[in-house]
Amino acid sequence: MQQRPLGHTGKDISVIGLGTWQLGADWGDVSEADATAVLASAADAGVTLFDTADVYGDGRSETLIGAFLAQRPDHRITVATKMGRRLPQEPANYSPSNFRAWIDRSRRNLGVATLDLVQLHCPPTAVIDADATYQALDALVADKSIAAYGVSVETCAQALAAIARPNVTNVQIIVNPFRLKPLDEVLPAAQAAGVSIFARVPLASGLLSGKYTATTTFAADDHRTYNRAGEAFDRGETFSGVDFEVGLQAVSRLAAALPPEVSLPAASLAWIASRPGITSGIPGARSVAQARANADAAALLSGGFDLDNFDAVVRQVYDDLLRAAIHTLW
């Protein structure tokens, strides 16, 4: 799989990574055996970026990844974890002492002395803007608790604030055919600064899988049931903030523009990876088949699929169905 530089770290990561929220919680139950099989399938397909967080399954996702990688001592996988959601989202909780506690817990979960990459997990804007935040992170780099750091954000304005900081390695932001604002507002600035962009929620919580209908239901403990209106956390995290029924209309139009041999999720992932300034898209997977299909989408970057035509369709559908409702929100 094609690899791209991770900021200024000297490391390369795959253009399609693996998001592991699904292996922790909030998507229904996934067994340990199934989770391990997903990790193996992704790694065997050339994925060299695993994205996780200390709150995914209260550390379960990190622990599963740590155990898996311990069995592959020669792996080339970069593990990007996140911190900051274990306490109420108040700026005072983003303190050096809490950073240390969270980092040490993740190091134990992953079984490593130095974390590859730690990202603040969608913190309040005041945290992103504070000099003290980056001073504390720089101290963790200096003592080799972490090798690099970045920020996962909700809004384009937050992304730009993080990109302006000299030692930020990456920014995570939602980018997919339902979220186009970052293409013009964030990606050029990231390219100029040498900051990597991870496109998170690349399949809009599965909506871009093309498998859902108006009668589809989800488990009670699945955020696609309990967070559609932002009841538990930012509603942009669920279906990218798009109304489910409107999203289905958009999916229908996007799918109709594809040749029969190209699936909508594969086209979406390839489109994301082809956007200038994107380093990696990080789709999640709950099964070996999903993990393999996501990784295989990278092959569309090598030709045989008209990405320019799909881009034109994406932009038209966005303008017709989505722009008015969501463009100004994030």
At which residue positions do the language-model features occur?
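N-terminal binding-site loop/beta-alpha segment at the start of enzyme catalytic domains
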Residues: 1-76
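Short, well-ordered coil/turn segments that N-cap beta-strands
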Residues: 11-16, 46-49, 73-77, 112-116, ...
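Acidic-and-aromatic substrate-binding clefts and catalytic sites of carbohydrate-active enzymes
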Residues: 28-29, 53-62, 87-89, 125-128, ...
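Conserved, mostly hydrophobic/aromatic
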Residues: 6, 18, 35, 50, ...
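Beta/alpha (TIM)-barrel catalytic core signal, keyed to glycine-rich beta->alpha loops juxtaposed to Asp/Glu
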Residues: 123-317, 329-330
